[in-house]
Amino acid sequence: MEIDNQNINNINNNNIHNNINNNNINKRNIENNINNINNINNNISMKNKNNNIDNKKNSNNNNNNNNNNNNKNSISNNNNNNNKSFGLYSLEQPAPLPLWLLVIVFGVSISVIVFLFLNFPSLSPQHKQLIRLPKNFKDVKLLSDILSQYTDDNYFIVITTFGVIYTFLQAFSIPGSVFLSFLSGGLFGLKVGFPLVCFVATLGATFSYLISYYIGRNLVRKLFPDKLKLFSDSLSQKRDNLLNYIVFLRITPFLPNWFINLASPLLDVPIHTFAIGTFIGIMPATFLAVKAGIQIQNIQNPSDIFDLKSILTMAALALLSILPTLIQKKLKVN
C-alpha cells in the first residue's frame, strides 16, 4: 500500500511538473505570440512611417513642381506683360522687318513726289527757283502767291502733289507740315483745305504708326527708352478712355506729334483708336492754320494766328477731351 501511495505521489508530482512545464511552454508561446504581434505592429508602423515619408516627399515634390510651374507661369506672364507694355499685342507680334526696307519705302515715296513734279504745270524759270518746301512763314507767303496762279488751271495735280508731300512729311516725321497747313488755306480755301489737311495729316500719322510697328519698333525702343516708359505709365492710367486721351495729346503740346506716332504702336494703342483720336485732335489747330492761310498775305507774324482767344479755345477743347477720364476717376474714388 505504501508503495502504491508513493507511486501515486510520484505520478502526481510528475503531472504537476508536466503541468508546470506546459504552463511555462504556454507562457513562452504567449510571449512569442505577443512578440510576433509587436513585431508585426512595428513593421506596420514602420511601413506607415515610410509611406508617410514617401507621401511627404511626393507632396513636397508636387509642391515644388507646382511652385516651379507657378514661377514659370509668373515669369511668362511678366515677360508677356513686359512685352505688352512695349508692343502692340506682343504675343502675336511678328519679327520686325529689316531696316533696309525703310530705305526702300523712303526711296519709293521720293520717286512718287519727283514724278508728280515732272508732271507739274510748266513754270517760269524764276518761279521754278522758288518752288521748295517752306521753312518759314515768309516762304509760305511766297509759295502761296506763286502756286495760286497755277491752281485754277491745274487743280488736280496741285492738290494731289500737296496731299502726297504732306503725307510724306508726316509719315517720316520730317518738319514742315505746319507750313503746308497754312498754304492749304491760300490754295484751296477753308471748305477744301480744312478736311484735306485733317485727312492727309491723319493718313501720314497712320503710315508713321505702321512703319514704326513693322520696321522700326526696335530702333524706337533703343532711341527713346525713357520717353517710352513715361508715355507707357501715362497710358496705363487712361486705358478706359484711351480715345479721349489721344485727342487730348493731339490738342495739347505735352508730347510732340512725331513721338506719339512712333510710340503708340509699341504701347498697345489700337490703330483705329489712334487714327480717330488723331483726326479729331488735330482739328482745332488745323482749322486755325487753314483759316489763317486764307488771309496769309495780311499776316505779318505767325504769332498773330494763335492769339489769346485761340489759345483759350484750344485749352477748353483739351479740357473737354479729357473730361470723361476725370469724371470716371472721380466716380471710382467715391
Swiss-Prot record:
Record-annotated membrane-spanning stretches = 97-117, 156-176, 192-214, 246-266, 269-289, 305-325
Residues carrying a glycan: N43, N83
Q: Where in the cell is it found?
A: Membrane
Protein topology in the membrane: Multi-pass membrane protein
Residue ranges for the region (Disordered) are 47-79
Q: Which GO terms describe its biological process?
A: autophagosome assembly
Q: What is its main location?
A: membrane
Cellular component terms per the entry's GO annotation? endoplasmic reticulum membrane
Per UniProt, what is one Pfam family of this protein?
A: VTT_dom
Q: Which UniProt keywords apply?
A: Glycoprotein, Membrane, Transmembrane, Transmembrane helix
Check the record and name the PANTHER family matching this protein.
Answer: PTHR43220, TRANSMEMBRANE PROTEIN 41B (PTHR43220:SF18)
Q: Which family does it belong to?
A: Belongs to the TMEM41 family.
Q: What is this protein called?
A: Transmembrane protein 41 homolog
Which classification does the entry list for the species?
Eukaryota, Amoebozoa, Evosea, Eumycetozoa, Dictyostelia
